[in-house]
Design a protein with these regions (language model features):
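Non-catalytic peripheral regions of nucleotide-handling enzymes
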Residues: 21, 127-176
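Structural motif
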Residues: 2-9
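Long beta-strand-rich cores associated with HINT superfamily self-processing modules
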Residues: 9-141
């Protein structure tokens, strides 16, 4: 993800290749992480989500959502595919919170709609411009995003919903 740029095509589960419309990075210092543990990454070790998934270690923000396709999701929620925040999948083993590190850079990219993309072989979400996620983007990047997508400033962008239903903490534990 560190080498992606605006215009680069990204594979999506539902719409094939889609161009990146906007991309930004936010760096979090060691001091930031020590002050606020919520800024530490959630790490998925290889195989944490199933055989070979992810293929390599995957580190994401706590709120980044992971695709879960499981019979339990269908049984409990009537949807065979759901999105779950990384923090709700932490199990202290193959999915754990990383300790504060010298520097962590989060990369966000926006497509024409909310999509499911591949991250080290795991299915995760593209950036979803909602009030909570916009707070994760620094001021200059947020202004750039509002310039490119003016409706975002009032949260009226044509992203009517997420790519899959989103489970909350208690719900997520049923499929984790």
């Amino acid at each position: 993800v560190e080498n992606l740029a605006v215009g680069d095509p990204v594979w999506t589960l539902d719409a094939g290749l889609q161009p990146i419309r906007w991309i930004a990075q936010r760096s979090v210092t060691l001091a930031d992480q020590q002050r606020d543990a919520r800024l530490c990454r959630v790490v998925f070790e290889p195989g944490a989500l199933g055989p070979g998934v992810p293929a390599q270690r995957l580190a994401v923000s706590r709120q980044h959502r992971i695709w879960c396709g499981d019979w339990r999701a269908g049984l409990y929620f009537g949807q065979p595919e759901v999105l779950v925040a990384a923090k709700d999948l932490v199990n202290g083993g193959l999915v754990h919170v990383a300790p504060p590190q010298a520097a962590v850079t989060y990369v966000h990219f926006l497509l024409d709609g909310h999509q499911i993309v591949s991250s080290n072989g795991a299915l995760t979400e593209s950036f979803f411009p909602a009030a909570l996620s916009l707070g994760a983007v620094d001021g200059a990047a947020r202004e750039e995003l509002f310039t490119l997508f003016p409706d975002l400033a009032t949260l009226r962008l044509a992203f009517p919903k997420t790519a899959r239903p989103v489970l909350r903490g208690r719900e997520a534990r049923l499929v984790a």
